[in-house]
């Protein structure tokens, strides 16, 4: 029986392996290794059939001295073949065989023989892993021009080529996402696959990586594209206001509620709702949110009539939800509800070659908005390409606009950039967090405390005091008290020091049971 807290680590490790850029067989081997590391297995493996129906990938659990010398028993082979043929899962005494599906068709199987009795929760976890494997296989096939697989072409000695489909449609075009890097193309391929379903999506990545842009892309590529796309930043509102915004309210529900008002769920009925910064929702509100996500029904604030809606919910966060679950700050059931298909957005520093493309787009937007005719000199793009951009695409946009505004001529040169004049505001972030700034934020997982990671995880720009507090090596509680003392116990001022919102600071004060002093 797998412990509840271990399931989160297993799911994270498997997801991390499957989103890598290695060949499919290597990804599946890495996933199998992760399963062996976390589970007590007697045997196990992943079998994937090629586009012609023949077995072409057979990954075996690395148990024992020589994996290659082991062959499947008649019972194992029979169970695997039946699952692939029927698309239905199979259970043995201490074993389970789950179908791996692409476009609802079983193209392989994940089979596990447990060394001890398993439970329903173990089988549920493995079912989620089988779905992730299926999405990985589908992405691999999407990258091949003839509907086969990149891995199949590589095995045949061919060089896989990414070509447009014979009859491209408007659905293949996402104008507002710019880039040609392999990291971005992988995410776009997954986005197009996920958009064709109604599955819940969790967009994860550092601040400024474009989570809202990808949410819009999922909506635009889905069958819901003709309906509304509604967004809400959960971190920007207090719990009471957040409830009213999401669920709406009746006339007279509270002071100032002069009219009945529809909430975001009602407005998004039939369409898509983006809940940004979902990791900042309080535990009390999480229970209310879980109900509408599970049942699709709710009541307006102050009302008694139950309303039903059909909404696809996309959540986004730059927080480490797994750690939040383990700390009891985020409900595990809500985590599983929103994390059906996680999409991890790469930071700008991992998108080779995209900085120059994005910079040209942002400069063109600046020219159109200000009736200017600026362009980049030869050395300007080199300067931009060497920057780490901890604020990612958002910071690059700001950098281009600021430089174009203050440039001495219409041709932007290297000397026009703030970083060449020792005036780069993001230098404080890099100094506070080191050169490897935000390396884990792409996965929403920081090894450090949430408050310490807040310098890079939030859009707010921290003050110089934040770097001092950060560098002091204090605990999260002590850092919070230190910031409040410097701010004269004014939450709004402390929030600016820490680079967080007042609501986040208020929640942290309650969580650490810190009484606010009157000065």
UniProtKB/Swiss-Prot annotation:
Quaternary organization: Interacts with sigma-54.
SMART domains the UniProt entry points to: AAA
MF-aspect GO terms: ATP binding; ATP hydrolysis activity; DNA-binding transcription factor activity; metal ion binding; sequence-specific DNA binding
Record carries keyword DNA-binding: yes
Inter-domain linker: region residues: 406-476
Name recorded for this polypeptide: Nif-specific regulatory protein
Keywords tagged on the record: Activator, ATP-binding, DNA-binding, Metal-binding, Nitrogen fixation, Nucleotide-binding, Plasmid, Transcription, Transcription regulation, Two-component regulatory system
Protein residues bound to a divalent metal cation: 419, 424
Domain of life: Bacteria
Entry's Gene Ontology BP terms: nitrogen fixation; phosphorelay signal transduction system
Domain Sigma-54 factor interaction: 177-405
Cited PROSITE patterns: SIGMA54_INTERACT_1 (PS00675), SIGMA54_INTERACT_2 (PS00676), SIGMA54_INTERACT_3 (PS00688), SIGMA54_INTERACT_4 (PS50045)
C-terminal DNA-binding domain: region residues: 477-519
Function field: Required for activation of most nif operons, which are directly involved in nitrogen fixation.
Alphabetical list of InterPro entries matching this protein: AAA+_ATPase, GAF-like_dom_sf, HTH_Fis, Nif-specific_regulatory_prot, P-loop_NTPase, Sigma_54_int, Sigma_54_int_dom_ATP-bd_1, Sigma_54_int_dom_ATP-bd_2
UniProt-annotated binding residues for ATP: 205-212, 268-277
Residues annotated to bind DNA: 491-510
């Amino acid at each position: 029986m797998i412990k509840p807290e271990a399931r989160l680590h297993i799911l994270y490790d498997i997801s991390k392996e499957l989103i890598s850029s290695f060949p499919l067989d290597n990804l599946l081997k890495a996933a199998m290794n992760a399963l062996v590391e976390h589970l007590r297995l007697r045997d196990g493996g992943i079998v994937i059939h090629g586009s012609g129906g023949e077995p072409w990938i057979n990954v075996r659990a690395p148990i024992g001295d020589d994996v290659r010398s082991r062959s499947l028993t008649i019972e194992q082979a029979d169970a695997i073949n039946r699952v692939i043929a029927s698309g239905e899962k199979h259970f043995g005494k201490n074993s389970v065989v789950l179908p791996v599906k692409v476009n609802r068709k079983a193209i392989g199987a994940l089979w596990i023989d447990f060394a001890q009795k398993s439970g329903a929760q173990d089988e549920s976890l493995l079912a989620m892993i089988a779905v992730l494997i299926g999405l990985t296989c589908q992405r691999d096939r999407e990258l091949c021009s003839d509907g086969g697989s990149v891995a199949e072409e590589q095995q045949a000695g061919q060089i896989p080529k990414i070509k447009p489909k014979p009859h491209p449609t408007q659905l293949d075009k996402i104008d507002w996402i710019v880039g040609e890097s392999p990291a971005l193309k992988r995410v776009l391929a997954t986005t197009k696959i996920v958009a064709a379903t109604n599955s819940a999506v969790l967009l994860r990545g550092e601040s400024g990586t474009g989570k809202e842009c990808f949410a819009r892309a999922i909506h635009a590529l889905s069958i819901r594209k003709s309906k509304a796309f509604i967004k809400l930043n959960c971190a920007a509102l207090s719990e009471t206001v957040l409830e009213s915004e999401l669920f709406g309210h009746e006339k007279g529900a509270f002071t100032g509620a002069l009219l009945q008002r529809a909430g975001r769920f009602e407005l998004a009925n039939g369409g898509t709702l983006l809940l940004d910064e979902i990791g900042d929702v309080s535990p009390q509100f999480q229970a209310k949110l879980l109900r509408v996500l599970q049942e699709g029904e709710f009541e307006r604030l102050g009302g008694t009539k139950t309303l039903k809606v059909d909404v696809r919910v996309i959540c986004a966060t730059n927080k480490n939800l797994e750690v939040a679950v383990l700390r009891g700050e985020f409900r595990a059931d809500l985590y599983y509800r929103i994390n059906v298909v996680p999409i991890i957005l790469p930071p700008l520093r991992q998108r080779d070659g995209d900085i120059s493309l994005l910079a040209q787009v942002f400069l063109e937007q600046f020219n159109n908005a200000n009736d200017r005719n600026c362009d980049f000199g030869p050395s300007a793009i080199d300067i931009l390409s060497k920057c780490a951009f901890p604020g990612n695409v958002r910071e690059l946009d700001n950098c281009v606009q600021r430089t174009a505004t203050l440039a001495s001529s219409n041709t932007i040169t290297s000397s026009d950039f703030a970083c060449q004049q020792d005036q780069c505001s993001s230098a404080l972030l890099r100094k506070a967090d080191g050169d490897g700034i935000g390396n884990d934020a792409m996965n929403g997982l920081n090894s450090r405390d949430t408050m310490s990671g807040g310098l890079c995880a939030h859009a707010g720009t921290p003050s110089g005091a934040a770097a001092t507090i950060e560098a002091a090596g204090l605990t999260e509680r002590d850092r919070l008290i230190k910031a409040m003392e410097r701010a004269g116990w004014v939450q709004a001022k402390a929030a600016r020091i820490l680079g967080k919102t007042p609501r986040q600071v208020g929640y942290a004060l309650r969580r650490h049971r810190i009484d606010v002093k009157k000065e």
